[in-house]
């Protein structure tokens, strides 16, 4: 008597989180503990960074953005930063994805004031970025998205939010507070009213303090400029505390705490 074949067990994929980071460090600096905790809990974690293109022969302000970090003009600054990101993601348990869009200094923003000013009328990078995000959503089918609130007002952060707004639909999104800008007194919050109206979601990542620190410290080229060195990074993370704070659109993931919207982001 023939034995009927045994049907294979259905493949059940772990839940998936996709973090959309403007730059190569934003996700780790702002929510590295959350990324690590989700990875430790069995989630598949991907961090897709928007503005990572290497631009040969940088000029003007774009060149200054690498020379002020001690790099020579012929250095491939973004290749260095992508390598740092790969190291950081390995620490946090995430897969890095690098989208091929140029940073703001290569799109006509000529000084630091412009980076934190109004988005240029001719800067429409959010349209092709939205197309790329839509492709990622189709490919990865994330359970949850993470993205910045735009605290600090950097144009690249604001344009990423515009791009995500085009394609997010009813997705569940945790919007992070952009660190280190959020830790600075009177940091601009151009979208503050929007996010303060959403419920707050918090996650205690105290158990992953060291992993969060080591992930952030992997961005060695940025530590002097952003924090004054690794020791000061550690101090700033300690000052920020072990709780990472978000605003929530949609259904919250397990493990955190949800509260009402409030002033302060």
Task: Give names to the regions the model predicted.
Residues 2-5, 75, 83-115, 119, ...:
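The feature marks non-catalytic terminal segments
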Residues 2-167, 213, 262:
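Active-site beta-strand->loop->alpha-helix modules in alpha/beta enzyme cores, enriched
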């Amino acid at each position: 008597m023939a034995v009927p074949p045994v049907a294979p067990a259905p493949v059940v994929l772990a839940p998936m989180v996709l973090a959309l980071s403007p730059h190569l460090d934003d996700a780790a600096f702002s929510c590295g503990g959350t990324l690590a905790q989700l990875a430790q809990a069995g989630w598949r974690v991907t961090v897709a960074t928007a503005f990572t293109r290497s631009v040969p022969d940088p000029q003007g302000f774009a060149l200054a953005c690498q020379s002020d970090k001690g790099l020579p003009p012929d250095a491939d600054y973004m290749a260095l930063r992508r390598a740092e990101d790969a190291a950081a993601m390995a620490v946090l348990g995430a897969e890095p994805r690098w989208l091929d869009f140029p940073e703001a200094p290569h799109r006509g923003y000529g000084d630091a004031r412009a980076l934190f000013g109004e988005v240029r009328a001719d800067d429409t990078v959010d349209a092709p970025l939205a197309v790329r995000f839509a492709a990622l959503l189709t490919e990865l089918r994330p359970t949850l998205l993470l993205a910045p609130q735009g605290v600090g007002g950097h144009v690249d952060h604001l344009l990423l939010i515009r791009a995500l707004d085009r394609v997010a639909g009813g997705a569940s999104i945790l919007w992070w507070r952009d660190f280190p800008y959020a830790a600075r007194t009177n940091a601009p919050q151009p979208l503050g009213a929007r996010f303060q109206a959403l419920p707050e979601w918090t996650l205690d990542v105290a158990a992953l303090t060291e992993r969060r620190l080591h992930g952030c410290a992997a961005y060695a080229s940025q530590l002097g400029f952003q924090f004054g060195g690794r020791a000061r990074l550690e101090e700033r993370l300690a000052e920020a505390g072990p709780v990472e704070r978000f605003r929530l659109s949609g259904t919250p993931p397990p493990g955190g705490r949800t509260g009402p919207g409030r002033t302060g982001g």
